[in-house]
Swiss-Prot record:
Transmembrane segments: none annotated. One of its GO terms (cellular component) is cytoplasm. One of its GO terms (molecular function) is translation release factor activity, codon specific. Signal peptide: none annotated. Peptide chain release factor 1 directs the termination of translation in response to the peptide chain termination codons UAG and UAA. InterPro entries: PCRF, Pep_chain_release_fac_I, Pep_chain_release_fac_I_sf, Prokaryotic/Mito_RF, RF-1. This is Peptide chain release factor 1. It is found in: Cytoplasm. Methylated by PrmC. Methylation increases the termination efficiency of RF1. It comes from Cupriavidus taiwanensis (strain DSM 17343 / BCRC 17206 / CCUG 44338 / CIP 107171 / LMG 19424 / R1). Keywords: Cytoplasm, Methylation, Protein biosynthesis. The keyword Nucleotide-binding does not apply.
């Protein structure tokens, strides 16, 4: 293992000792926020320290076995012990490398998922509805909560745009690689002659701000408009000005919410979406600066990146970032996304490990 990595592990082991001492103090719970922060840090450091302790023990075992090689009676035993210790060291080194990978601070957050119809007109809007169902079904399989924050329906029951909030354990970490362009190839319901059409939607996955105050929004930078809600096809909606449109003047971000009959609740939803979009914009700007020196194999998550194709006649889903094709389109569209999402996470981890090797 490289000296830089060993030094990092020594620092983490020392920090765990410090955290243990702080948590053992009589007044540890006097500041509950600080106590929670220390508890989370303890939970993150403990597995690393435990693995590092095992690694050092394996090093000691190797040194002891090598010292026995000069004893003719112990030579065979020592050779077996050396082989076993080297195997343990190799496995522990790989495990420690994974534990040392930089953690995305947003991984444990809830998220906002936005789907927009793109090229393809009404068929694109219908595909947006299919994607919404796919993500909703996946969330249900994880026992996550799903809430519609904003929706704009098309005439045939699709969506020009829809935003949902997904709340659950490590939700963002599982779905964060879904941002980008999703292309569909199929015979549309509106096609009379059976020709295959290509349409597209864009998906944006944004970590939810822990609270709106986490993202600084100056009230003077907001323009708030209220108007009467309206639905597709002349559906009945309430007759008061309950719909809310927020315009963030510095960034030009516009958010509309009209799904609730309460103007106050619509404004609360709109503020959550606005905070997430501003945070997402800030995160992408930081990632763009980082990407100038290193390109992530999974891609930037930019909406202009075509990341996946859903080919219904062939029954396949292809993720272009990792060259993965799965012939189980019906299962995936029904929310069975684990194989796909796990492959993306594994590729991302491999990319991080390669970067760690370059930096070490």
């Amino acid at each position: 293992m490289k000296a830089s990595m060993l030094a990092k592990l020594d620092q983490l082991a020392e920090r765990l000792d410090e955290v243990n001492a702080l948590l053992a103090r009589e007044d540890a719970t006097a500041n509950i926020d600080q106590y929670r922060k220390l508890s989370r840090e303890h939970a993150e450091l403990s597995p690393v320290a435990e693995q590092y302790s095992q690694y050092r023990q394996a090093q000691d075992d190797l040194a002891t076995a090598q010292a026995l090689l000069d004893d003719p009676e112990m030579k065979d035993f020592a050779a077996d012990e050396i082989a076993a210790a080297r195997d343990r060291l190799e496995a522990l080194q790989a495990s420690l490398q994974r534990l040392l990978l930089p953690k995305d601070p947003n991984d444990d957050r809830n998220l906002l998922l936005e789907i927009r119809a793109g090229t393809g007109g009404e068929e694109s809007a219908l595909f947006a509805a299919d994607l919404l169902r796919m993500y909703t079904r996946y969330a249900e399989r994880q026992r996550w909560q799903v809430e519609v924050m904003s929706e704009s329906e098309s005439d045939l029951g699709g969506y020009k745009e829809v935003i949902i909030r997904i709340a659950g354990d490590a939700a963002f970490s599982r779905l964060k690689f879904e941002s980008g362009g999703h292309r569909v190839q199929r015979v549309p319901a509106t096609e009379a002659q059976g020709r295959i059409h290509t349409s597209a939607c864009t998906v944006a996955v944004m970590p939810e701000a822990d609270e709106v105050g986490e993202v600084e929004i100056n009230p003077a930078d907001l323009r708030i408009d209220t108007f009467r809600a309206s639905g597709a096809g002349g559906q009945h909606v309430n007759k008061t000005d309950s719909a809310v449109r927020l315009t963030h003047l510095p960034t030009g971000i516009v958010v509309e919410c009209q799904d609730d009959r309460s103007q106050h609740r619509n404004k609360d939803k709109a503020m959550k979406v606005l905070a997430a979009r501003i945070k997402d914009m800030q995160t992408r700007a930081a990632q763009a600066r980082e990407a100038s020196t290193r390109r992530n194999l999974i891609g930037s998550g930019d909406r202009s990146d075509r990341i996946r194709t859903y080919n219904f006649p062939q029954g396949r889903v292809t993720d272009h970032r990792i060259n993965l094709t799965l012939y189980k389109i019906d299962m995936i569209m029904d929310g069975d996304m684990d194989e796909l999402l796990s492959a993306l996470s594994a590729e991302h981890q491999a990319d991080q490990l390669a970067a760690l090797g370059e930096d070490a």
